[in-house]
Amino acid sequence: MTRFSAMLDACVLVPVTLADTLLRLAEASLYRPLWSARIITETVRAIKEVHPQLSADDIRNRADAMDAAFGDASVTGWEALEHVISLPDPDDCHVVAAAIVGRADLIVTSNVKDYPPDVLAPYHIEVQTPDVFLLNQLDLAPLAVMSALNRQARSSRKPQLTLDTLLDHLATCGTPDFARTAKTQKWRLAAEHQSSHILSSRHRDGL
């Protein structure tokens, strides 16, 4: 079965915490992530500007790790379509072109105004902010999303983040509604832990 696909614009891949969350949900098979070599180039350039303290190698390694983890994410062969697309900002046409070729269901971007619905409608592509996209994922698969967030918090280092602190960081990355809603769903993790503990006890007791 073909998975739901989302083209990730460079602006949602630059914030490290947000990008990590988006990719962890993809790793959990909640959707198929898409990008292009040009989007990655824009991401690398933007990260250098936002985080000048990071070395070029570290930034490039992050991009290479994304491609390695999601081997089918990078869309190719979109260049011929770029000049057919008409957008308020011509520099964004490559994103739509890659989304069309990659058969994306939607584009996740913080700049939704740059992608008019009437331009995307003929290609059956929607546009969503990362806040709306993550809220939808939480609604569709609440436990999977909360589990991914919990793993993300636990894997953080220097300092290690609590789940609440992680969600606070995400709120500053343009996903305030998602962060606020996710905080109300933490009970799912406790319920899952309790259920797993009960099952483990029964298995241990031979029940």
Describe the residue ranges of each PLM region:
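PIN-domain endoribonuclease scaffold, especially VapC-family toxins
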Residues: L34-W78, M146, Q152-D177
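PIN/NYN-family metal-dependent endoribonuclease catalytic core
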Residues: S5-L8, V16-P52
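Short, flexible loop segments at the rims of nucleotide/cofactor-binding pockets, characterized by
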Residues: E82-P88
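A generic structural signal for alpha->beta connector loops
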Residues: L30, G71-D72, H124
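Acidic, metal-binding active-site segment of PIN/NYN-like and related structure-specific nucleases
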Residues: D92-I125
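Amphipathic coiled-coil/heptad-repeat helices and related helical stalk/stem segments
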Residues: L18, D91-D92
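Acidic, PIN/NYN-like endoribonuclease modules and their adjacent C-terminal/linker elements
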Residues: K113-H203
